[in-house]
Amino acid sequence: MNKAPTTLIIMDGFGLSNDTVGNAVRAANTPVLDGLFSEYAHTTLKASGLDVGLPDGQMGNSEVGHTNIGGGRVVFQDLPRITRSIEDGTFFENPAYNKAMDDCLAKGSALHLYGLHSDGGVHSTLDHLYALLKMAHIKGLKRVYIHAFLDGRDTPPTSGRDFVAKTMEKCRELGVGKIATVMGRYYAMDRDKRWDRLENAYDALVYGEGVQDPDPIHAIEESYKNGVTDEFVEPVVCDKDGMISDNDSVIFFNYRPDRAREITRAFVDPAFDGFKREFFPLTYVCNTEYDATMPNVLVAFPRISVKNGLGEYLSKMGMTQLRIAETEKYAHVTFFFNGGVEDPYPGEDRVLVASPKVATYDLQPEMSAYEVASKCVERIESGKYDVIILNFANCDMVGHTGVFDAAVKAVETVDECVGQVVEATLKMGGIAMITADHGNAEQMLQSDGKSPMTAHTTNVVPFILCGAGTELREGRLADIAPTILDVMGLEKPTEMDGKTLIVR
């Protein structure tokens, strides 16, 4: 017997804003979504700050959004968790940090601190780096090197200079730490096996290869003059004494896993074969658990279990479920949605569609959305699944490029693809829910009305319920899973503190 699925469509980076200037969502021609808003019950959801377990006012992101959606509860995120440990002093007692620094003292080796060098709050925060510098100072370490991965994606594209200047001032204040390398996240934080980029980063970190400039501020300013902003700054070597070598300690202070995995594997996994490099022993600390299978690492803040999230609960109830996305968001509908669990639950199938191999997604704003939609429709029509979780990456990934016209095309592509999936779901007698994990494409310009805005936003996101005539209340991302269970006639597990959006 064919199943009538409940399909959750996540339009990544599709926020709502009344502003018209720089708003790719409003500028786009979206006949499908316009029709769905007109015909079906809809509301708005909060997707940032305290409503998703982040600090007040902090913009949401894909990892946090999917964790909250899948968990059916507000999941306390790594950023405030680590920050709280600094405030209560337990940060400085952390066994992993202490092991890394004590090994440096015992071996006379260097400590390397690297991560995304910004206050974007998506992958990292400089407050955590500065706490590590303070700890190194207290312990009396002398050789401490910072490798600055510039952002320009979750922060303004030319903000990196000021972040590095701030860090240099902090080093002078503490009397410890030097900037050894500077490079854009494009090189050091790839997540799609673009090994040529990662190799450039590795060669700078280990072999001192790249642009040579002892002044990191000058190097960044020169890059800006050449039209190359933070995200894409080519690897610069500022201090050849600060290269990573045998028996050194490394602390990667990013707390978000997805863009920390590849470069970490290059350093710690003897079986790594993305490019040729020598393997040497390090004391390597991951700030959080980047991958449960990662060898030769210490984890400063192990994962907190999200028990009885939607995926686990549906599996226990004997339900079948599908997760489908292209490469850029595949980890989000699987690993993050399942609360950091790598392996699928019984009854959970996964479909990965390859993201296009382009330098930046403004060059192909359609990305792989049409193939994702086609494969999803095929599986809806199979009648196999009770629940389908789908992500369209376009609005977020193209929004990050800051190219307005491309973002408009991305929104229009998603609109068309949403229509295909909703139509297939309703034909099977199912229910479709349409939402987003955070905003992005609805704000493509900064407050000056001119400069590109490449970061996420704190705007609310939509929630549309197709196929079930009802009234909806306003809510937050944690309320989606309870709503799914509600329309399926299933009791909510006690661990979920989210509440159904349906007004009874």
Residue ranges and their predicted role:
Residues 1-504:
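Feature captures the catalytic ectodomains and active-site-proximal regions of enzymes
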